[in-house]
Regions:
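Alpha-solenoid helical repeat scaffolds
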Residues: 24, 56-62, 91-96, 112, ...
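Short, acidic Ser/Thr/Gly-rich low-complexity loop/linker segments typical of extracellular
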Residues: 448-462
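Short coil turns that delineate tetratricopeptide repeat
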Residues: 51-54, 88, 122
Length: 519
């Protein structure tokens, strides 16, 4: 829940004033204002007071809805299941229960509930899409990608830690959002039940030890929310989301930038991207700082939260009119947490594209025919929410965020890396007649990649070579007193690191022995 504050809470600035009546008035008001954490307690209180069966069912559904909005999948499932057993006639209870089960990795059971929902509402594509999502998740978990991930317990806390960016161009410092103790103002959010988020920084030393995170300067952090940082290539300009008062004393979520001045961040400047009453957040800046992609629910979108793009002619120019990223990127669901890779590809999180559950991380590559969107699959993605990926320049290494089980807090930061694919060739050369080991044999490796190297077998008859990906190889073995022998191998079609083994037998050259009268 913490990670989407920038878009959800902004509704506070534009909601009309209304007076509600009845035992759920306070709960309904909290829910409408996005204060879902507060709404849970208020609805439970109202449920205990309610006498009418239908009213109690409605309240149970709203308790489940509130848990859904704070991403508490376990409690959401429990309350949806309760209201379904009571005969509540809203098909969405079945759909959202299936979503909650999928978010907990209960794929087989979730598939059954998606099928039940399709029976209740055959015209809604979300039922079949849920079944497809669960089937894909099961397949992807059975065939994980080569990415390795590690929880950054060095600076994660028991609270929510997310939204990370590099703060130095040598990647030795990071800035991230956190709702930990020590946040400016020390106030608890009615939306999340945690402290309002601030931006923190941490630095790694030469021994790989990370420093204790400390808040950024007070000129950046306020008593309310700051989060989702993005930095330029030189790491001397910071873009971030902030929740601040406008001139009419309304709380509005906007994007700000701050330039570094004498090693300190300067006065933040608001980016003029939308009217005052329109919430914008989650900035992603390109390396040249001429393109900015951000999140908004402004008019002209495709459903929930959409990705929008704005450009400018140079760094001193004003930003142009935002343009929606289009239906290849945006869906009827939510698209958030964009990141512009140095190679021009776009990474973002979505619960609208087919995924494993909750928010999944996607890579979008632009070609002549438009954008091609691919799921990052497992283990980058999980049944939980996975979001906010950043890369260490063009290296296959960086960070992302997740609320998957096994973390330290409600949202954690994870490091990921893609180990290089490594192929080795090894084998033993033996006497084909006696099976004796042959030392000192010449092994010549000739490859389609241009390789042409020779090595001699060790005293144990072994040889070793490093191989290139996607190449064919011939192996020629020679030794005095033996006939030459040949073999072949290939790395074509191999997608994971592997040690190939080719043992070779040399047959004694009996003709040569006969010349010397040896039998």
């Amino acid at each position: 829940m913490k990670r989407i504050f920038a878009i959800t809470i902004a509704a506070l600035a534009v909601l009309p004033t209304f007076a509600q009546r009845g035992i759920t008035a306070k709960a309904d008001r909290a829910f409408e204002l996005g204060k879902y954490f507060d709404a849970i307690d208020e609805y439970k209180y109202a449920y205990a007071k309610a006498k009418d069966k239908d009213k109690k069912n409605q309240i149970m559904f709203m308790v489940a809805e509130s848990y859904r909005m704070v991403q508490n999948s376990r409690q959401a499932e429990i309350w949806y299941r309760k209201v379904i057993k009571k005969g509540y006639e809203n098909p969405l209870a079945t759909l959202y229960m299936a979503d909650a089960m999928r978010a907990q990795g209960q794929y087989e059971d979730a598939m059954k509930e998606y099928q039940n929902y399709t029976k209740l509402n055959p015209s809604d594509d979300r039922g079949p899409a849920g079944v497809e999502s669960c089937a894909s998740a099961i397949e992807w978990m059975g065939q994980p990608t080569r990415y390795k991930i590690e929880n950054m317990h060095y600076f994660n806390s028991k609270y929510s830690d997310f939204g990370i960016a590099y703060a130095k161009d040598d990647y030795s410092m990071v800035i991230f959002s956190s709702s930990r103790e020590g946040c400016t103002g020390g106030k608890i959010s009615g939306v999340t039940g945690e402290y309002y988020c601030d931006l923190f920084r941490s630095r790694v030393d030469r021994k790989g030890k990370w420093s204790e995170p400390v808040p950024l300067e007070e000129i950046i952090n306020t008593a309310y929310e700051e989060g989702m940082p993005s930095t330029n290539k030189k790491c001397n300009t910071l873009y971030f989301t902030s929740f601040r008062e406008d001139k009419n004393k309304n709380m509005v979520c906007k994007i700000f930038s701050s330039a570094k001045e004498n090693a300190e961040w300067g006065e933040p400047k608001e980016l003029n991207l939308a009217p005052d009453t329109v919430a914008v957040g989650h900035p992603a800046i390109s390396d040249d700082e001429l393109t900015l992609i951000f999140v908004s629910e402004m008019e002209g979108g495709y459903g929930g939260k959409d990705l929008w793009k704005t450009t400018r002619a140079n760094k001193s120019s004003e930003w142009g009119k935002p343009v929606n990223m289009g239906p290849a990127i945006n869906t009827a669901g939510d698209e958030m947490f964009p990141y512009i890779h140095p190679d021009g590809s776009l990474y973002f999180s979505s619960n609208g594209h087919p995924g494993m559950g909750g928010l999944d991380i996607f890579k979008a590559s632009e070609g002549n025919s438009g954008w091609k969107v691919d799921n990052m699959k497992y283990p980058i993605n999980s049944s939980s929410d996975d979001f906010g990926i950043v890369f260490e320049s063009e290296m296959e290494r960086g960070y992302f965020c997740s609320n998957r089980p096994g973390g330290k807090g409600s949202d954690d930061i994870y490091q990921f890396s893609l180990p290089p694919i490594e192929f080795t060739l090894t084998g033993i050369v033996r006497n084909g007649k006696t099976d004796a080991i042959i030392a000192g044999a010449e092994v010549n490796l000739i490859g389609s990649d241009g390789t042409n190297i020779t090595a001699k077998t060790e005293t144990d008859g072994s040889y070793n070579f490093n191989l290139s990906p996607n190449a064919d190889y011939r192996i020629v073995v020679k030794r005095g007193g033996f006939l030459n022998s040949k073999d072949k191998t290939t790395t074509k079609g191999l997608t994971d690191s592997e040690q190939l083994r080719v043992n070779i037998d040399l047959q004694p050259d009996d003709r040569r022995m006969d010349l010397y009268g040896i039998e």
